[in-house]
Swiss-Prot record:
Protein name as annotated: Pyridoxine/pyridoxamine 5'-phosphate oxidase
Domain of life: Bacteria
Keyword presence, Zinc-finger: no
PROSITE patterns in UniProt: PYRIDOX_OXIDASE
Its job: Catalyzes the oxidation of either pyridoxine 5'-phosphate (PNP) or pyridoxamine 5'-phosphate (PMP) into pyridoxal 5'-phosphate (PLP).
Family: Belongs to the pyridoxamine 5'-phosphate oxidase family.
Alphabetical GO biological process terms: pyridoxine biosynthetic process
Organism name: Pseudomonas paraeruginosa (strain DSM 24068 / PA7)
Catalytic activity: pyridoxamine 5'-phosphate + O2 + H2O = pyridoxal 5'-phosphate + H2O2 + NH4(+); pyridoxine 5'-phosphate + O2 = pyridoxal 5'-phosphate + H2O2
Binding site for FMN: 64-69, 79-80, 86, 108, 143-144, 188, 198
UniProt pathway annotation: Cofactor metabolism; pyridoxal 5'-phosphate salvage; pyridoxal 5'-phosphate from pyridoxamine 5'-phosphate: step 1/1; Cofactor metabolism; pyridoxal 5'-phosphate salvage; pyridoxal 5'-phosphate from pyridoxine 5'-phosphate: step 1/1
Length: 215
């Protein structure tokens, strides 16, 4: 490495986060921040990219980057192979955490909650608007399973292309969406001298309560 890790740092000076300017509903604040990220983050950065953390049946944590594909008053939706490693982990322990980081805005959002599968109709609706290659890939790839080499994956894709040569692929039963039902949402805004702003929303008795956390 050309630079010491201990010397890598930057000052956060772009903005602040005060209770006076933060709505009581965390979904409203998330939408505001997400819209800001869409306008500000430079391509090819994907503002809907997030880290999804899960825990397997043995208590081991796992995380990976996914794309947020839905947001409404119920929660945050993403799609994957139900038979993948993350799918098996969510079946064993249906709780997860998400983290969004928008460095250009010096902002981070952490979300924790329970997981539910979306309906088959919701999964199919999203599947049908995906590019054809992605739809075929959902059939072809045995996600998270060991394969011999890249050639095996390409062979599986070729077989899938032949299978659906004369018909549009339907949504596989092993593929679909999950929704994270948030119980906690924390908004982090970088500030100078590492004295960051942190507003923590917790869902209690059907309402959202908000507190400020020390950085």
């Amino acid at each position: 490495m050309t630079q010491s890790l201990a010397d890598m740092r930057r000052e956060y000076t772009r903005d602040g986060l005060s209770e006076a300017n933060a709505p009581s509903d965390p979904f409203s604040l998330f939408r505001q921040w997400f819209d800001d990220a869409v306008k500000t983050e430079r391509l090819p950065v994907e503002p809907n990219a997030m880290t999804l953390a899960t825990v397997d049946a043995d208590g081991h944590p796992h995380c990976r980057i996914l794309l947020l594909k839905g947001l409404d008053e119920r929660g945050f939706t993403f799609f994957t192979n139900y038979e993948s490693a993350k799918g098996r982990q969510l079946a064993a322990n249906p709780r997860a955490a998400m983290t969004f980081f928008w460095p250009a805005l010096e902002r981070q959002v952490r979300i924790e909650g329970e997981i539910e599968k979306v309906t088959a109709q919701e999964s199919d609706a999203y599947y049908q608007v995906r590019p054809l290659g992605s739809r075929l890939g959902a059939w072809a790839s045995p996600q998270s399973r060991v394969i011999a080499d890249r050639a095996e994956l390409e062979r599986l894709l070729a077989e899938t292309e032949r299978r659906f040569a004369d018909q549009a692929p339907s949504c596989p039963e092993h593929w679909g969406g999950y929704r994270l039902l948030p119980q906690r949402i924390e908004f982090w805004q970088g500030r100078p001298s590492r004295l960051h702003d942190r507003l923590d929303y917790r869902h209690q008795d059907g309402v959202w309560a908000r507190e400020r956390l020390a950085p």
